[in-house]
Amino acid sequence: MAGFGLPNFGQITEAFKKAQQIQQDAQKLQEELDDMELEGTNEDGRVTVWLSGNQQPIRVKVENSILKEEEEIVEAAILEAMQKAHEISTSNMKSRMQELTGGLNLNLPGINDDN
């Protein structure tokens, strides 16, 4: 420690280097998440939704057979596939962000939550 209880210049420099590295890693992670295609499929496999790692919709596949069903069944199948894709995508993002910030004890809403 330097005088007056302040950290020495070397510690400050090291902290800035670490912050810059995290920023670079975060930018790389953002690009990786954008390029991912994570899929969620409804229970009977007739509807599939793909999202990016950032929860952006990419595409939807609906089998012809389900279109012969009642409207509520089709809607429920699409919603189920969307929810599964979103769950997979958000879980992946949280995991990747925790890897990035590991050990820093950052309180990031939605990332460090146990919910």
Swiss-Prot record:
Alphabetized GO MF terms: DNA binding
GO CC term, one of those recorded: cytosol
KW Zinc-finger (keyword) present: no
Pfam (any one): YbaB_DNA_bd
Chief subcellular location: cytoplasm
Assigned keywords, A-Z: Cytoplasm, DNA-binding
UniProt subcellular location: Cytoplasm, Nucleoid
Function: Binds to DNA and alters its conformation. May be involved in regulation of gene expression, nucleoid organization and DNA protection.
Entries under HAMAP family matching the protein: DNA_YbaB_EbfC
Membership in a protein family: Belongs to the YbaB/EbfC family.
Quaternary data: Homodimer.
Protein name: Nucleoid-associated protein Pro_0020
